[in-house]
């Protein structure tokens, strides 16, 4: 699934050995502005925390929230199933429109 509204938002993922942390930035002009803090998985329930954060911002369209949460699910599932075995570079190749750091 491709994020269609990448011109509005981008996911950022901190790729760690025992956790991942996911945040959303808003695209503003040629740069980005943090929209959320980082939410950790599996230390905390990053998906639920991110969902609550997005729902607290009524100006974000429902379809945008759904797309961002679906992509978050894909990243979490990848990390759980395969990612712990793979490098940051492989994760970036798997999700080229998401920013990975580690």
From Swiss-Prot:
A single GO molecular function term of this UniProt record: structural constituent of ribosome
InterPro entries cross-referenced by the UniProt entry: PSRP-3/Ycf65_sf, Ribosomal_PSRP3/Ycf65
Keyword Zinc-finger: no
One GO term describing the cellular component: ribonucleoprotein complex
GO BP, sorted A to Z: translation
Highest taxon of the lineage: Eukaryota
Gene3D superfamilies: 3.30.390.140
Main location: plastid
Keywords: Chloroplast, Plastid, Ribonucleoprotein, Ribosomal protein
Name of a matching Pfam family: PSRP-3_Ycf65
Subcellular location per the Swiss-Prot or TrEMBL entry: Plastid, Chloroplast
Known partners and oligomeric status: Part of the 30S ribosomal subunit.
Family: Belongs to the chloroplast-specific ribosomal protein cS23 family.
UniProt function note: Probably a ribosomal protein or a ribosome-associated protein.
UniProt-listed PANTHER family: 30S RIBOSOMAL PROTEIN 3, CHLOROPLASTIC, OS04G0461100 PROTEIN
Protein's recorded name: Small ribosomal subunit protein cS23
Gene field: ycf65
């Amino acid at each position: 699934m491709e994020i269609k509204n990448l011109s509005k938002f981008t996911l950022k993922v901190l790729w760690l050995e025992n956790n991942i942390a996911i945040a959303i930035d808003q695209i503003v002009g040629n740069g980005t502005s943090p929209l959320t803090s980082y939410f950790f998985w599996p230390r905390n329930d990053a998906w639920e925390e991110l969902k609550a954060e997005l729902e607290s911002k009524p100006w974000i369209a429902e379809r945008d929230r759904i797309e961002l949460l679906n992509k978050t699910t894909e990243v979490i599932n990848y990390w759980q199933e395969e990612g712990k075995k793979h490098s940051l570079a492989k994760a970036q190749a798997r999700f080229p429109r998401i920013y990975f750091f580690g």
